[in-house]
């Protein structure tokens, strides 16, 4: 049995091109009919804490797995992520446990890459301006993969990213594209500024569209929200 902790998973991902990660998501979605996916089990706890348990069998790959992920508020003196998870990977025809994997980084990766994949499928093909709300780890993965998939196809169009100023988080996004002269930035002070004039909006925070409840952009058909 292999044990892959957070750093081991991150090291594998670091060697994998973002465009390849998007291809994996695309392949998984196309194979969806081959998966046995029971409903996710949600176990609520006090103060909004919870566990989610997600089993799956993929017979064609001889794989069975379960992911258990939980969100728990940080207690005083603790140094950990509020969201943590683990994945158990089995041979489906024998029940032999083959791997215990950290699920935290994979969950962040899956969420960001899936959003980038959806945006490539559904946003207007002539997009130029992309608004970003919530500039954490998921957004970092998402926008990096989104731009990488364009470049992998030879699309060198100019893309403007609209970022909200928030505790310096915008700098991390800007640093991602330091070597790409065709990615430009507009720094904004409000969500309305981020959304106004954007062809596509990624919202990677707990509020989503509710972050701008009183603006005409919330239900705009001229924009694509993810």
Model regions and ranges:
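Glycine-rich Rossmann-fold phosphate-binding loop(s) that bind the pyrophosphate
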Residues: 135-136
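NAD(P)-binding Rossmann-fold cofactor-contacting core
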Residues: 149-178
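Aromatic pocket-lining residues of Rossmann-like dinucleotide-binding sites
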Residues: 146
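Short helix-loop-beta connector
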Residues: 122-129, 219-221
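N-terminal Rossmann-fold NAD(P) dinucleotide-binding loop
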Residues: 139-140
């Amino acid at each position: 049995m292999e044990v892959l902790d957070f750093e081991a998973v991150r090291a594998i991902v670091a060697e994998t091109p973002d465009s390849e990660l998007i291809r994996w998501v695309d392949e998984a979605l196309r194979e969806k009919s081959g998966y046995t996916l029971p409903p996710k089990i949600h176990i609520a706890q006090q103060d909004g804490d919870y566990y989610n348990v997600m089993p799956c069998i993929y017979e064609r790959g001889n794989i069975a797995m379960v992911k258990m992920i939980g969100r728990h508020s940080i207690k005083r003196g603790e140094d950990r992520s509020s969201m943590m998870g683990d994945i158990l990977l089995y041979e489906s025809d024998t029940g032999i446990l083959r791997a215990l994997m950290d699920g935290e980084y994979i969950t962040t990766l899956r969420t960001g890459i899936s959003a980038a994949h959806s945006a490539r499928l559904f946003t207007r093909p002539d997009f130029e301006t992309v608004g970003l709300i919530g500039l954490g780890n998921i957004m970092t993965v998402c926008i990096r993969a989104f731009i990488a998939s364009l470049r992998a196809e030879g699309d060198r169009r100019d893309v403007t990213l609209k970022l909200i100023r928030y505790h310096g988080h915008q700098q991390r996004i800007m640093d991602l594209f330091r070597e790409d002269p065709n990615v430009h930035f507009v720094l904004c002070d409000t969500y309305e500024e981020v959304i106004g004039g954007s062809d596509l909006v990624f919202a990677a925070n707990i509020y989503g569209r509710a972050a701008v409840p009183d603006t005409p952009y919330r239900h705009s058909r001229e924009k694509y929200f993810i």
